[in-house]
Amino acid sequence: MQPRGDNLARAPQPERRRIRVRGLVQGVGFRPHVFRCAARFGVTGFVGNGPEGVVIEAQGEAIDAFLAALQEQAPPLARIDSLIQASLALVDESSFAIAATVAGAAAGAAIPADTALCDACLAELFTPGDRRYLHPFIACCDCGPRFTMTRRLPYDRDTTSMADFALCPTCEDEYSDPLSRRFHAEPVACHDCGPRLSQSIATVAGALRAGQIVAIKGIGGYHLACDARDDAAVNRLRSRKHRDGKPFAVMVLNTASAGRYVQLPDGATAMLQSRERPVVVLPARTGNHTLSPALSPGLSTLGLMLPYTAVHYLLFHALLDAPTGQQWLQQDHGLALVMTSANLSGDPLIIDPADAQTRLAGIADVILHHDREIAARADDSVVRVSAGATHIIRRARGYTPHAIKLAGGGPRVLACLLYTSPSPRD
């Protein structure tokens, strides 16, 4: 007869817990991650966006393993700051669900930052036959606009500017499929149901080829663009914008193209390719290259960035005469575009189409709008890489509104910052 005693392993007992997760857990694919972990460990209950982050009620025999997987295998954009648990009574249920968002003040929730187009979406963008082939607003759980389209918290589709675009049946299926990369991805859309451009990419590319200045509505505001190799166009932009000496940022397709124009010290390539996609100030190469000397007059540096939206990639694609396949994305083409903030000197970045149409009329020859509202303006971030270290010069798109954690202790200090750049009319 088998002896009985305390040394025998006890069979796991079901339990139920409420878990409140704070940090960067809204808009980064965290709820789908919770859903998949629940299915993996046989956990029932629900997960939803709440006023203080993400709220989970989990029931099962493997809650600890479930929670360990949540933290150790979190999505790439997620950041867990705290995880608070409380025991609950068991409930008669048999499934796990993504629940409706809990309304209320969002004191503990963090708005995610905008993120550059991911490799998976970039591949789909240039795959003929894919339903999002050449779609200017392709995105998924791992990439796309977040902060700049958020109207209020908690972060859900109906609290963002994507609320204006009802999902088509096919996108709805992807949005509801736990195995899809677009499961509860709020920016999800397609050619049939998503935002639209005011004119074709081909028209804009033609204007750039002709030496014209183009205003382009992006995710956080308008850019002014021209061919960075066209000295007359660059000087014309400088004159129209009344920007005598300040350098212009330049966008190139990839780091192979960047290496043609700048030196790439340790850390520079990684920063250029980072999900934040800032303007990276780097030592300019001297000698015979084709960029206009009016880009950064009197300076030995050049600010470069890589494309971070589908519209940017589509522009390069059109300017290169629509190459097929994917290899062209990594090749050095030498193509370079000025991408500078579209604002009058001293004024904040323009985000409204009507405002852009009026105030940029004397600067831009062509204006490319889209009909997704920019809920929060965000200029391009600017960083400098030196001796392998990154120094942030302007902390904006890609970093905003992530908090900066400070060491404890020291005096209490009140810091105030204007939401937009001051203007003479303020």
Outline where the language-model segments fall.
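Intrinsically disordered, low-complexity, mixed-charge
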Residues: 1-187, 191-195
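A phosphate-binding glycine/aspartate-rich beta-alpha loop in the early core of alpha/beta enzymes
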Residues: 87, 221-288, 375
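N- or domain-start disorder-to-order transition segments that initiate the globular core
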Residues: 196-206
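Glycine-rich phosphate/diphosphate-binding loops that line cofactor/substrate pockets in enzymes
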Residues: 204-212, 326-333
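General beta-strand structural signal in soluble alpha/beta enzymes
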Residues: 214-217, 224, 250-252, 273, ...
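Divalent-metal (Mg2+/Mn2+/Ca2+)-assisted nucleotide/phosphate chemistry catalytic cores
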Residues: 271-272, 279, 283-347
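Internal gly/pro-rich beta-alpha loop/helix module
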Residues: 320-323, 331-409
